[in-house]
Amino acid sequence: MGSSFQQYYWMNFLLLLVFILIPHASCCFSSIFSFGDSLADTGNLKISSPNETIHFFFPPYAEYLGLPLVRPYLESQKSIQNFEGGVNFAVAGATALDATFLEEMGDSNPRTNNSLGIQMDWFKEILPYFCNISSNCSEFLSGSLILMGEIGGNDYNDALLGGKSIEQVQEYVPLVIEEIGLSINELIELGAATLLVPGNVPIGCLPIYLTNYEGSDKSDYDPSTGCLNWLNKFVEYYNEQLQTELNRIRSLHPHVNIIYADYYNAMMYLYHSPEQFGFIGGTPKACCGGGGTYNYNSSAQCGMRQASACQNPEEFISWDGIHFTEAAYKWITNALLKGNYTDPCISSLCVSTL
């Protein structure tokens, strides 16, 4: 997922996952390699767009805590020392499908053309920094954790927000699933043995969509959450297809740990009872925005001069109408690592002390 280059950045999901996972998983994984979009980007978009102003809203917690950083691939000094803890290939705005194909389909994505295929090329380019022969690489990757996504959300976002119908966007699902499956298979063939693969989030609860489709029929909304049912049903369909593909890959590679991360149901649990967890800021309004029913305005997005941020972001689920707040990311991270939102349960690996 992605938004304006001018937005403030938040503590993203990957950083929180690493903060909580590494102290428990350091005995199992020597490195983390991450692919995806803005839910995992730790700097690649900023590096690839040096003339754009991107503000960082939170301090460098990982450095302060002494935790290994999963550094962005596009850092200029590529060496094994700089990438000791792994590499992050994720780029905000990235898609699963190739940018050229999406342009041919009439979808415009001005943020980045760094699709999953390009991120995979980066991975293969840097792999020799860690190992130099196939047997070496297989051994190295078997001790690494691969985070595959979330990726694919922007393929749907760009199409839906560009005016395509849900029926047209649904035709993208098998293509996105195929691209993710091909990448997973390629990583396994190179030696990967543990992969965490998230599904998509409930986009029907995001202020950007609630604003875009504001005025929809009352029956289109879930009365208990205020979310758009038809958009969330689409995400449910996509996530089901993704899990079917993961099951197919598991049957081909029974020795590999492929963990599905259920972002959708973890977030829906939060949306159904926000006050119970301290989110009293008026769900599903955004904390930072330019006004309107859901505090999202495409002409005054978070970070633009006309927008302003709330004083209590810890009480909001949505940060900028597109992404979640640090508090929400922390909640979902804990839910994934300590709850029932991964299949198989992530604690069934060596993370025994969670």
What are these regions (language model features)?
Residues 2-354:
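Conserved active-site regions of diverse hydrolases
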